[in-house]
Amino acid sequence: MRAAVRSTSLALAASLAACAPAARDRGVSPDAPLPARMKVADAGAGRAVFRQCAACHTINEGTGDRDGPNLYGVTRAQVGHNSQRFGYTAALQSVGGRWTCARLDRWLTNPAAFVPGTSMRFPGLRNGLDRADVIAFLYANGGGTPDCR
């Protein structure tokens, strides 16, 4: 009986470890500077993390907005102006400039801290590798190659 419980526990632990973000496998800490995280960023892993975002956002070209704007091409867009149909807050529109890797990283860390007055209710992604993966995924969807030095 103990052997069965032990092997079940080991199998469960191995399964959970396979699902967890593997910072060790990438050789970069989630707290490493953004350029180091972007060197190991994985757009495929970013697609999986983006599922959280898909509750409010779409990503395919030409797809309409939801509670949040469509994000196709956002990495080439001016902050607060990616979708002509979405009603961005004045706070977000006042940021100015374009989305950069650094800006996206700050936004994805804590949107309300980066832009007080934003309507985005998402609390942010704590894991820096998850943020880098999402940034890579956004660049892969209408944004070209990230320049995140």
Predicted regions and their residues:
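C-terminal motif of bacterial Sec signal peptides marking the signal peptidase cleavage site
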Residues: 16-18
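C-terminal capping alpha-helices of c-type cytochrome domains
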Residues: 98-149
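Secreted/processed peptides and extracellular or luminal domains of membrane proteins
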Residues: 25, 59-62
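Electrostatic cytochrome c docking/interface patches
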Residues: 21-49
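Bacterial N-terminal signal peptides that target proteins for export
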Residues: 1-9
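Gly/Gly-Pro-rich "capping" loops immediately C-terminal to redox-active cysteine motifs
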Residues: 47, 61-98, 122-124
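Sequence contexts marking disulfide-bonded cysteines in secreted/extracellular proteins
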Residues: 20, 54-57, 147-149
